């Protein structure tokens, strides 16, 4: 490819609305352009990277025995109503009607469509197991699209769906997909971790996320410092303290705290250790409960884990925090003065709170707290559950080592769905015993566009992108200095361009009438791994300057050796 016949579209300045480095560099390197909120046009350089990610994904899915299909982006609403997700999915599901007033959705995922296909196409257990995948555009009407293609409304996704007649068969495919995903992300060159995860709105039993480690990540990923344990913070179990609860040393005292409406203010004004405070959060109770709200208690320096809390049988799903008006209607006090003593609604406390003594909490009276609260003496110990986020230094749930926490970008997710969708859509086959058998399902997703952004978050420097070799838009850049004035430079540039292309190497020849500084800056911004510079001065000694983008090292190589050298560097 020649730059004179290519849309390079690089930018010198960083766009003001680009928050994370991948968004900034994708705009500056001419990979994407914003069309509307959460919608991006992919330019030639971006498409080249995207296609390389797609190809790696496709190769490994095929190697794992999956079969490629293509399903419509537009899906009829009746399938979503049949599965129950029409009501469950919420406003991220973009709904519309056609000219015949028939309701449809823009697909954020394709469980319903593939299950509908299979229930009409398969009839016998002998046809199973099967695993289908597609690489296709999805749409989710994000409330706040941000970070460029990291959280956009329209994106490219590889989604796969497997069908089985037994849990053992599902486990085999699940393990094969786990291995395929590991190969995909390793081939791309990402530093990633596979972690246990919550199944979320997709549903099902077992689930793993594939997280690319990066400071800009939206997820907290938890690891043991000793074992292979890894989990999303939503799922990581907070182990109960091993030490028995300390004996009470204080009497419970009612204290005026008119200016302490938060834990931080309480700690600062009364010089309390934050570990001796408890915060109380009120959430909506499950429909049909005799109480409208449920009180959830965590230690003052801990955070409520909303995923764990939502799984409590007495808590409404989705988890909804009570408004001040709702709180006052039940407790007769505001949110800053809540606690377990005389709480008129059901209470669930975290395991760590259950082990506390002599602690401070709201008195359920505005502007007052109780200090020196002790369980069973001042208030009966309520239901105890794991409802907090783990913190760094907590013991690992597998009993080996302590926990570390890093930020991660989710690029892949695999689920064991079980029979959630097949039961709802009545997808079954004749089993080996001749009876009708509901199918067991798995689903497996990779955010292809997100992989591109995640790769940049791990691979950049002050000059631009430093692509992993496997997904770089071009493998070699040829920079001929003053080629329009030097016939020797022009002739050699054309010769090397032809020879490298003949070897199957992707080359970008910069034949623009530009200053050398602009040419160097653009190639480094785009992140092409191998650059060769042709100039009259070096050619006087039969030399070509070679530079490797990742480490910035330069060396002079003889003109007769440069093609062989590059082929060896790229192909091994």
UniProtKB/Swiss-Prot annotation:
Its main location: cytoplasm. It is found in: Cytoplasm. It is an enzyme of class 6 (ligase). Keywords: Aminoacyl-tRNA synthetase, ATP-binding, Cytoplasm, Ligase, Nucleotide-binding, Protein biosynthesis. GO terms for biological process: prolyl-tRNA aminoacylation. InterPro entries: aa-tRNA-synt_IIb, aa-tRNA-synth_II, aa-tRNA-synth_II/BPL/LPL, Anticodon-bd, Anticodon-bd_dom_sf, Pro-tRNA-ligase_IIa, Pro-tRNA-synth_IIa_bac-type, Pro-tRNA-Synthase_IIa_type1. Pfam families: HGTP_anticodon, tRNA-synt_2b, tRNA_edit. GO terms for molecular function: aminoacyl-tRNA deacylase activity; ATP binding; proline-tRNA ligase activity. It catalyses: tRNA(Pro) + L-proline + ATP = L-prolyl-tRNA(Pro) + AMP + diphosphate. Catalyzes the attachment of proline to tRNA(Pro) in a two-step reaction: proline is first activated by ATP to form Pro-AMP and then transferred to the acceptor end of tRNA(Pro). As ProRS can inadvertently accommodate and process non-cognate amino acids such as alanine and cysteine, to avoid such errors it has two additional distinct editing activities against alanine. One activity is designated as 'pretransfer' editing and involves the tRNA(Pro)-independent hydrolysis of activated Ala-AMP. HAMAP family: Pro_tRNA_synth_type1 (MF_01569). Consists of three domains: the N-terminal catalytic domain, the editing domain and the C-terminal anticodon-binding domain. Homodimer. This is Proline--tRNA ligase. It comes from Escherichia coli O139:H28 (strain E24377A / ETEC).
């Amino acid at each position: 490819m020649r730059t004179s016949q290519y849309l390079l579209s690089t930018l010198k300045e960083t766009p003001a609305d680009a928050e994370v480095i991948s968004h900034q560099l994708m705009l500056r390197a001419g990979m994407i352009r914003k069309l509307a909120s959460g919608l991006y046009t992919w330019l030639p350089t971006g498409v080249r990277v995207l296609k390389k990610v797609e190809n790696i994904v496709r190769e490994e899915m095929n190697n794992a025995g999956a079969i490629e299909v293509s399903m419509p982006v537009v899906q009829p609403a009746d399938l979503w109503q049949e599965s129950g997700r029409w009501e469950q999915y919420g406003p991220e599901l973009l709904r519309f009607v056609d000219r015949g007033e028939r309701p449809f959705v823009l697909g954020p995922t394709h469980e319903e469509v593939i299950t509908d296909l299979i229930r009409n196409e398969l009839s016998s257990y002998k046809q199973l197991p099967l695993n289908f995948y597609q690489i296709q555009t999805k749409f989710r009407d994000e409330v706040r699209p941000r970070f460029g293609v990291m959280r956009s409304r329209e994106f490219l996704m590889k989604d796969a769906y497997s069908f089985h007649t037994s849990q053992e068969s599902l486990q085999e495919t699940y393990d094969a997909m786990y291995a395929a995903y590991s190969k995909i992300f390793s081939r791309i060159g990402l530093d990633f971790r596979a972690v246990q995860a919550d199944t979320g709105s997709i549903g099902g039993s077992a689930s793993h996320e594939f997280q690319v480690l990066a400071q800009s990540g939206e997820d907290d990923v938890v690891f043991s410092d000793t074992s292979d344990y890894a989990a999303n913070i939503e799922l990581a179990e907070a182990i109960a303290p091993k030490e028995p609860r300390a004996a009470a040393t204080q009497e419970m005292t009612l204290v005026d705290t008119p200016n302490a409406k938060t834990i931080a203010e309480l700690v600062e004004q009364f010089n309390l250790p934050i570990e001796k405070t408890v915060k109380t959060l009120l959430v909506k109770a499950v429909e049909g409960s005799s109480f409208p709200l449920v009180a959830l208690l965590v230690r003052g320096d801990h955070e409520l884990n909303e995923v764990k809390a939502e799984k409590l049988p007495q808590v409404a799903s989705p988890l909804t925090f009570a408004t001040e008006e709702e709180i006052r209607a039940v407790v007769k006090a505001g949110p800053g003065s809540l606690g377990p003593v005389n709480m008129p609604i059901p209470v669930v406390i975290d395991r760590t709170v259950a082990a506390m003594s002599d602690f401070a909490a709201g008195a359920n009276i505005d502007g007052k707290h109780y200090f020196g609260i002790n369980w069973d003496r001042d208030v009966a110990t309520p239901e105890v559950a794991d409802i907090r986020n783990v913190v760094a230094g907590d013991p690992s749930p597998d009993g080996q080592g302590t926990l570390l926490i890093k930020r991660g970008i989710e690029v892949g997710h695999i689920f064991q769905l079980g029979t959630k969708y097949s039961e709802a859509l009545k997808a079954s086959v004749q089993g080996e015993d001749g009876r009708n058998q509901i199918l067991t399902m798995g689903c497996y997703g990779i955010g292809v566009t997100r992989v591109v952004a995640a790769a940049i978050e791990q691979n950049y420097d002050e000059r631009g992108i430093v692509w992993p070799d496997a997904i770089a838009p071009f493998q070699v850049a040829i920079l001929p200095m003053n080629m329009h004035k030097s016939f020797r430079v022009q002739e050699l540039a054309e010769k090397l361009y032809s020879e490298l292309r003949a070897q199957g190497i992707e080359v970008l020849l910069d034949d623009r009438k530009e200053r050398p500084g602009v040419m160097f800056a653009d190639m480094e911004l785009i992140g092409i791994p191998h650059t060769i510079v042709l100039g009259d001065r070096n050619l006087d000694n039969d030399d070509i300057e070679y530079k490797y983008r990742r480490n910035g090292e330069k060396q002079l190589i003889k003109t007769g050796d440069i093609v062989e050298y590059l082929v060896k560097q790229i192909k091994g």
